[in-house]
């Protein structure tokens, strides 16, 4: 289709006789994301590109493109747009550009793109590296790399008829033309690359410079071998120079990789500069080849004195440059140069406190290190040991050149003794002739000493130590056993059972026959009844004796019990002793030793005082402290039942008990409150107050308290007299009967209720709901409050099975001995066709009682608050309800 359009346009041109000039941009502006061609405003301008794959075949897969032209300052700026990314801009030198004249809408697409003077050249060009002379693939990145060039060949100045191969399928829509891989064949030197094939825009490039990785000289064969890369294969293109002097006698012994220079000999030590140039491309930095000094022997000096070191060998002096003097190092120390010939050198070595063995020696001429064919190294004087002794746990060694703590090491070994390293010892600093160290525990008496300084071991020395013991436990106060480790035994003879004498005892107690392990012998010895710390004893084994000390085990408490009457604490444990004068007992830091009632080694009885609080118990026996304190929890104490005037509400009444430790978790001390020998319900509780709810309806309550099975305070509570706060209108439901809801406080379910109308008395049956919900308590002093409502009153629901015809009557109520009588209004209620009637929750018309209001005596604590709350509600006095939060009942 596109070809037909082009032919049609050409045909129109020929018919009209119109001839269009080729596009001649005066400039091009471009970067990696856009390009603009600039034309004179009165001349033809470009409209689009037709990129070709080759000389004759356009790119059919190419997305549409166009130039968006506009006049800017009298010039026509044509910005190129394409529906595919710029990384896909590629085409041959035969690509076409379409042109339009300013005065004609006809588009002419016959012009060669190569005819454009200005167009985007390669931009932001980068190479992954330069190619080796042996040839390799190189990655080239940049913009417009294949615009008007290639695409799969890159023309070069080495041979324009043999372009480099560009890898990749350019017709693949995913192929990135800004990132191409080019195969460079083997070659050398500098050349030019032509990315657009016009020949007008050469880009200089070259093969990689020669690289020298190593060099080896063979003086016997007078050959120097140079290893590296990029030496190419043609000797005529290569130049080799040593210290600026060309070397004609060389061959390329391995293509690209190795050059061998023949007939070269040098007697002086030091560096030599090597330069290689391949096809006018030189090595980037001259390589330094070293002719090393050769060391065959070296003398030794004392490490703590200055000394002259003599080195023998070859190339130890420069005959060509007398000012070239070496730097000499022995280990990490400098040996100051004195003089030298080609075969012998002298230098001065300062004192070296660390010394050393087999230290490396280096004679460096101008940066070139020496070599030694027989591995010559330097060693300071060898240490010697002449004698050794043991006294009071300290070993002393006598010798020479013993070095310092940092460079020396000591190891002990022997029959029956595992190898033991001594990490802490002291060498005399003035003459290095003595060493002292603390002898560690050894199983056997005789041992060998291995002394090493800087890796040099002195002659082995043998020493014997005297008997020693180590106590490893603390015996109990009674029937105690002392475990003793034995060191420095005579392992060559059979030992009899040792004995122990404690304190001022006149008799010794036999111990067990020592048993052995890899580190020591062990025996067990009995100890007499006793307490305290640092007790002296004498240990005897065969003919040797040694003195030491031990401490008895500290007191410990395992558990506690409380006496049946609750008056005493019994602490059970160990090592309490039997003397009250030697024991101290502290509770919460206070001394309670005076309250000790009984004392035995395993039990301690203490009287309980009201002032005691839960806390840590600390016991000392004869100056011996407990390892860990015992936390003492005390049983609950009930002080009294605190209801004021021994009163409580009749309906769901609360009973308040005061005391301490009321929250104990011990089942044996659980606090329980009973009313008329019946269990009560816990309403609220903390360490000092317990509030329970009584569920009975009896007129008086005999309240008893218990701590576990032990009884506590008891009393008899009576109910405050009932009080009515609200009498609603009586509902008279036809066919259902009479319903009356009465609200108040301290109602009982022992009552008689009736409604008198005219001369007829209608008996009423009543149901009672107590007011106090199980998560509320009345209070008048808390900031977290809500107003009291009818939900906080007792609710009495009374009804009959028959209705009445009257509109008024007298309601009679009798609670035990307290009676109430009210004139009431009776309201007839008609039932709906589909009734769903239950206990009414909505307030009906109500009336406040005008007479018969009776209030019993108020009670203390919560009971009193309830009575006060009832009064407050009746007289509309502000009152609050406090919520219990976080309590578990």
From Swiss-Prot:
The knockout outcome noted for this protein's gene is: Mutant cells are unable to sporulate in isolation although they will sporulate when in the presence of wild-type cells. Cells form loose aggregates before disaggregating. After starvation, cells form wide streams that frequently break and form secondary centers before reaching the primary center and display cAMP relay defects. Cells fail to rotate. tgrB1 and tgrC1 double mutants show strain segregation in chimeras with wild-type cells. ComC, tgrC1 and tgrD1 triple mutants fail to form spores.
Domain of life (superkingdom): Eukaryota
Q: What are the transmembrane regions?
A: 852-872
Q: Could you name the Gene Ontology cellular component terms for this entry?
A: cell surface; cell-cell junction; external side of plasma membrane; plasma membrane; protein complex involved in cell-cell adhesion
Q: Name one GO molecular function term.
A: receptor ligand activity
Where's it found, cell-wise? Cell membrane; Cell junction
The record lists glycosylation at 68, 169, 179, 275, 321, 406, 421, 426, 450, 517, 559, 578, 588, 618, 646, 679, 752, 787, 806, 816, 823, 836
Q: Enumerate the spans annotated as IPT/TIG domain.
A: 120-207, 293-380
Please give the biological process terms from Gene Ontology that the record holds: aggregation involved in sorocarp development; altruistic, chimeric sorocarp development; calcium-independent cell-cell adhesion via plasma membrane cell-adhesion molecules; cell-cell adhesion; cell-cell adhesion via plasma-membrane adhesion molecules; cell-cell recognition; cell-cell self recognition; heterophilic cell-cell adhesion via plasma membrane cell adhesion molecules
The signal peptide, as residue positions, is 1-19
**Topology of this chain in the membrane:** Single-pass type I membrane protein
A matching Pfam family = Ig_TgrO1
Q: Does the keyword Cell wall biogenesis/degradation apply?
A: no
Question: Where is this protein chiefly located?
Answer: membrane
Ranges facing Cytoplasmic side: 873-889
The UniProt keywords, alphabetically, are: Cell junction, Cell membrane, Glycoprotein, Membrane, Repeat, Signal, Transmembrane, Transmembrane helix
- Extracellular side, ranges: 20-851
What the record says about the induction of its expression is: Induced at the loose aggregate stage and expressed through the remainder of development.
Alphabetical list of Gene3D superfamilies matching this protein: Immunoglobulins
Q: What does this protein do?
A: tgrB1 and tgrC1 are involved in kin discrimination. They play an essential role in aggregation and subsequent development. Could function as a non-diffusible cell-cell signaling molecule that is required for multicellular development. Has both cell-autonomous and non-cell-autonomous functions. Terminal node, epistatic both to comC and tgrD1. Activates tgrD1.
More about this protein: The tgrC1 gene is highly polymorphic.
Read off the PANTHER family from this record: IPT/TIG DOMAIN-CONTAINING PROTEIN-RELATED-RELATED, IPT_TIG DOMAIN-CONTAINING PROTEIN-RELATED
Name the record gives this protein: Tiger protein C1
Q: Which organism is it from?
A: Dictyostelium discoideum (Social amoeba)
């Amino acid at each position: 289709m596109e070809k037909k359009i082009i032919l049609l346009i050409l045909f129109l041109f020929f018919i009209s006789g119109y001839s269009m000039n080729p596009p001649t941009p005066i400039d091009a502006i471009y970067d990696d994301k856009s390009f603009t061609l600039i034309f004179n405003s009165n001349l033809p301008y470009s409209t689009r590109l037709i990129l070709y794959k080759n000389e004759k075949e356009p790119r059919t897969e190419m997305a549409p493109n166009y130039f968006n032209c506009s006049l800017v300052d009298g010039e026509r700026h044509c910005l190129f747009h394409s529906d595919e990314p710029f990384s896909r801009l590629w085409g041959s030198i035969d690509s076409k550009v379409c042109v339009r004249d300013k005065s004609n809408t006809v588009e002419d697409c016959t012009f060669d793109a190569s005819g454009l003077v200005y167009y985007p050249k390669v931009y932001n060009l980068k190479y992954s590296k330069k190619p080796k002379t042996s040839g390799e693939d190189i990655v080239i990145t940049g913009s417009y790399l294949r615009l008007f060039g290639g695409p799969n060949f890159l023309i070069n100045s080495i041979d324009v008829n043999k372009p480099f191969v560009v890898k990749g399928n350019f017709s693949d829509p995913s192929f990135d033309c800004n990132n191409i891989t080019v195969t460079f064949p083997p070659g050398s030197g500098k050349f030019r690359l032509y990315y657009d094939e016009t020949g007008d825009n050469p880009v200089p490039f070259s093969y990689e410079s020669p690289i020298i990785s190593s060099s080896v000289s063979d003086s016997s064969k007078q050959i120097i071998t140079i290893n590296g890369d990029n030496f190419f294969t043609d000797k005529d293109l290569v130049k080799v120079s040593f210290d600026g002097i060309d070397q004609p006698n060389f061959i390329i012994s391995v293509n690209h990789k190795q050059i061998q220079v023949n007939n070269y000999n040098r007697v002086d030590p030091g560096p030599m500069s090597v330069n290689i140039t391949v096809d006018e491309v030189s090595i980037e930095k001259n390589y330094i080849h070293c002719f090393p000094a050769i060391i065959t022997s070296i003398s030794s000096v004392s490490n703590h004195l200055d000394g002259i070191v003599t080195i023998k060998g070859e190339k130890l002096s420069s005959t060509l440059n007398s000012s070239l003097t070496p730097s000499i190092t022995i280990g990490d120390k400098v040996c100051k140069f004195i003089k030298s010939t080609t075969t012998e050198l002298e230098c001065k070595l300062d004192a070296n406190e660390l010394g050393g063995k087999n230290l490396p020696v280096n004679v460096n001429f101008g940066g070139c290190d020496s070599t030694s064919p027989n591995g010559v190294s330097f060693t300071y004087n060898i240490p010697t040991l002449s004698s050794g002794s043991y006294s009071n746990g300290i070993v002393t060694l006598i010798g020479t050149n013993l070095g310092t703590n940092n460079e020396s090491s000591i190891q002990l070994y022997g029959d029956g003794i595992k190898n033991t390293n001594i990490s802490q010892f002291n060498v005399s600093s003035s003459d290095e002739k003595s060493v002292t160290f603390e002898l560690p525990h050894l199983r056997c008496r005789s041992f060998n000493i291995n002394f090493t300084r800087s890796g040099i071991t002195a002659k082995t020395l043998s020493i014997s130590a005297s008997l020693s013991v180590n106590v490893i436990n603390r015996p109990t106060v009674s029937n105690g056993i002392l475990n003793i480790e034995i060191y420095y035994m005579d392992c060559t003879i059979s030992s009899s059972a040792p004995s122990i004498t404690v304190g001022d005892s006149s008799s010794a107690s036999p111990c067990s026959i020592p048993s052995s392990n890899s580190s020591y012998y062990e025996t067990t010895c009995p100890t007499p009844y006793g307490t305290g710390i640092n007790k002296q004893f004498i240990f005897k084994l065969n003919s040797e004796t040694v003195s030491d000390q031990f401490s008895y085990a500290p007191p410990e408490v395992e558990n506690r019990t409380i006496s049946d009457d609750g008056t005493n604490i019994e602490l059970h444990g160990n090592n309490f002793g039997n003397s009250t004068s030697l024991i101290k007992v502290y509770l919460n830091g206070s001394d309670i030793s005076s309250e000790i009632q009984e004392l035995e080694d395993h039990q301690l009885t203490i009287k309980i005082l009201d002032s005691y609080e839960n806390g840590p118990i600390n016991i000392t026996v004869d100056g011996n402290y407990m390892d860990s304190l015992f936390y003492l929890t005390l049983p609950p104490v009930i002080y009294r039942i605190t209801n004021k005037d021994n009163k409580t509400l009749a309906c769901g009444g609360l009973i308040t008990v005061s005391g301490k430790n009321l929250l104990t978790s011990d089942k044996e001390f659980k606090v329980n409150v009973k009313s008329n020998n019946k269990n009560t319900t816990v309403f609220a509780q903390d360490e000092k107050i317990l509030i329970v709810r009584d569920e009975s309806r009896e007129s008086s309550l005999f309240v008893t308290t218990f701590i576990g099975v032990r009884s506590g305070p008891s009393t008899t509570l009576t109910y405050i007299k009932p009080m009515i706060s609200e009498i609603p209108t009586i509902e008279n439901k036809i066919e259902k009967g009479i319903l009356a809801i009465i609200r108040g406080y301290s109602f009982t379910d022992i009552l008689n209720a009736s409604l008198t109308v005219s001369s007829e008395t209608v008996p009423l049956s009543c149901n009672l709901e107590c007011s106090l919900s199980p998560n509320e308590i009345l209070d008048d002093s808390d900031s977290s409050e809500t107003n009291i409502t009818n939900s906080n009153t007792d609710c009495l629901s009374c009804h009959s099975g028959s209705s009445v015809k009257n509109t008024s009557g007298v309601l009679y109520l009798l609670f035990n001995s307290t009676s109430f009588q009210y004139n009431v209004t009776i309201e007839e209620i008609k039932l709906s066709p589909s009734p769903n009637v239950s206990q009414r929750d909505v307030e009906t018309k109500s009336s406040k009682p005008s007479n018969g209001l009776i209030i019993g005596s108020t009670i203390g604590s919560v009971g009193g608050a309830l009575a006060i709350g009832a009064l407050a509600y009746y007289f509309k006095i502000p009152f609050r309800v406090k919520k219990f939060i976080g309590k578990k009942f």
